[in-house]
Amino acid sequence: MNIEERINIINFDKGNGLIPAVIQDYKSKEVLMLGYMSKESLKKTLEGDTTWFYSRSRRKLWNKGSTSGHFQYIKEIKIDCDNDTILISVNQKGAACHTGNKSCFYRDL
């Protein structure tokens, strides 16, 4: 399946053009973060070897690690049963969270 065919499987309509992308560590399976992807950021992710997201606050694409050097190298991408969420397993270089923590999910509620 080519990249366009892979993108067309996904239902972007439910999220107003965005889908949630759960990022997990490839080896430990720890959830590192949740980001949102547009068709364009997903295409860039599928074309390369690092993750791209759509920033809802800045309203633009961003490559995770482009500023910090904490890139997420893609190992595997899976889609959920409703075709509206993806799970990306990565080899995380450095911290995934902007706070410097390995995971964005480090606080108890």
Swiss-Prot record:
Positions bound to Zn(2+): C81, C97, C104
Chief place of localization: cytoplasm
Pfam families: PRA-CH
Keyword Phosphoprotein assigned: no
One GO biological process term: L-histidine biosynthetic process
Binding site for Mg(2+): D80, D82, D84
Pathway membership, UniProt: Amino-acid biosynthesis; L-histidine biosynthesis; L-histidine from 5-phospho-alpha-D-ribose 1-diphosphate: step 3/9
Record protein name field: Phosphoribosyl-AMP cyclohydrolase
